[in-house]
A protein has these predicted regions:
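C-terminal boundary motif of the adenylate-forming
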Residues: 39, 77-104
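Generic, well-ordered alpha-helical scaffold segments in large soluble proteins
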Residues: 20, 27, 39, 74, ...
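Conserved C-terminal "lid"/linker of ANL adenylate-forming enzymes
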Residues: 83, 133-192
Length: 192
């Protein structure tokens, strides 16, 4: 597809949804191609790489389409970071909400760097923020300018499926997060 969506067709692909013509029409085009909803690209060796979901695309105020997962995947490997949600739909630039790792990564980092451990304390600690900024800067050096994170906020709580930010399979509920953290998101656009 022109928009980067992965489409598949062949004898191994289902012909449609069982007893659901409506879902079949939504998923299959008139030529029989199954629209997966995944965004993909082909690398230099000819391998297909999934880079995000079509429904998760952000469109900046300049009309640029951004797959947030691609940027998030460059930042998330840092020991401090548990979750990250890149935002910027309809905005001039991208920002991010960052949640510290509550499964031991942040605690271990705090011990190694002589920082008092608590999610609340660390979210405000300049040493922690500087370490995350370094990771963001490294990620920014690997992507196009339009994909770069200009600002971020470290949140003082963890995201879970029970608190509403994650699905039971621990995927981000982007719309819920945008609603719950609207104030924090808007604060990143007030001065820039």
């Amino acid at each position: 597809m022109e928009d980067g969506e992965l489409c598949i067709k062949g004898h191994h692909v289902a012909q449609g949804y069982y007893k659901s013509d409506e879902q079949t029409k939504e998923t299959f085009d008139s030529d029989g191609w199954l629209h997966t909803g995944d965004l993909a690209e082909i690398d230099s060796e000819g391998y297909v790489k999934i880079i995000g979901r079509k429904k998760e695309i952000l469109i900046t105020s300049a009309g640029k389409n951004i797959a947030p997962v691609e940027v998030e995947d460059l930042i998330k490997p840092h020991q401090l970071i548990g979750q990250i949600c890149v935002v910027g739909d309809g905005k001039k630039y991208l920002t991010a909400l960052i949640v510290l790792d509550g499964d031991g990564g942040a605690e271990s980092w705090a011990s190694d760097n002589n920082v008092e451990y608590s999610i609340e304390n660390m979210a405000k600690n300049q040493t922690v923020i500087d370490a995350i900024q370094k990771q963001v800067d490294e990620a920014n050096s690997q992507v196009a300018q339009v994909q770069q994170i200009k600002k971020f906020v470290v949140l003082e709580k963890e995201w879970t499926d029970s608190s509403g930010e994650l699905t039971p399979t621990l995927k981000l509920k982007r719309n819920v997060i945008a609603e719950m953290y609207n104030e924090e998101i808007e604060s990143m656009y007030e001065e820039g």
